[in-house]
């Protein structure tokens, strides 16, 4: 896998968005002509190594769209966007979830998946797990199965994996 290359293209930005936070910036990875492709290929290899065989990919707004579409293309699968409220034109399911300061919601079309689908959730970052768990809850409202979740990065020590206990969770890089 290209993990050293991928990690080298993620910039560490201290004190952003506030003092004491080390922000992991993926824009240099995306700006590299090979960055997105190598990341999607590494994700596909991780899935193969774990025996995960999804039938469709779901990506959480907004950076999950970038990596999710790229991975879906590598896997030859379709892609479903998990959106912020009010962005989808047809009937939706919605899940509200808590943030550090307040709450937010995510939505998907009610007919986004078939009950036989094995859905792979893709996002750039696993931190506390709140957004990922809300995405899982949405998928399960459709009666589809969650095949697994894959992230480009995981921040250790923030309990994201514990929130997703019982699901197959992978991350390419841990910080």
From Swiss-Prot:
Q: Name one GO molecular function term.
A: AMP binding
Q: What class of enzyme is it?
A: transferase
Return one Gene Ontology term, BP aspect. Answer: AMP salvage
What domain of life?
A: Bacteria
Q: Which UniProt keywords apply?
A: Cytoplasm, Glycosyltransferase, Purine salvage, Transferase
Reaction catalysis annotation: AMP + diphosphate = 5-phospho-alpha-D-ribose 1-diphosphate + adenine
User: Might you give the EC number(s) for this enzyme?
Assistant: 2.4.2.7
- What does the protein in this record do? Catalyzes a salvage reaction resulting in the formation of AMP, that is energically less costly than de novo synthesis.
Q: What is this protein called?
A: Adenine phosphoribosyltransferase
């Amino acid at each position: 896998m290209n993990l050293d290359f991928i990690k080298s293209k993620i910039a560490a930005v201290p004190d952003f968005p506030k003092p004491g936070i080390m922000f992991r910036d993926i824009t240099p990875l995306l700006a590299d002509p090979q960055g997105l492709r190598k990341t999607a290929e590494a994700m596909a290899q991780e899935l193969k190594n774990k025996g995960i065989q999804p039938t469709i990919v779901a990506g959480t707004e907004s950076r999950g769209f970038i990596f999710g579409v790229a991975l879906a293309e590598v896997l030859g699968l379709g892609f479903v966007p998990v959106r912020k409220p009010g962005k989808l034109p047809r009937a939706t399911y919605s899940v509200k979830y808590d943030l550090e300061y307040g709450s937010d919601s995510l939505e998907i079309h009610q007919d986004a998946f078939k009950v036989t689908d094995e859905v792979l959730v893709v996002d750039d970052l696993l931190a506390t797990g709140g957004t990922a768990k809300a995405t899982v809850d949405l998928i399960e409202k459709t009666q589809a199965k969650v095949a697994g979740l894959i992230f480009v990065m995981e921040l250790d020590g923030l309990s994201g994996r514990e929130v997703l206990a019982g699901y197959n969770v992978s991350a390419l890089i841990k910080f």
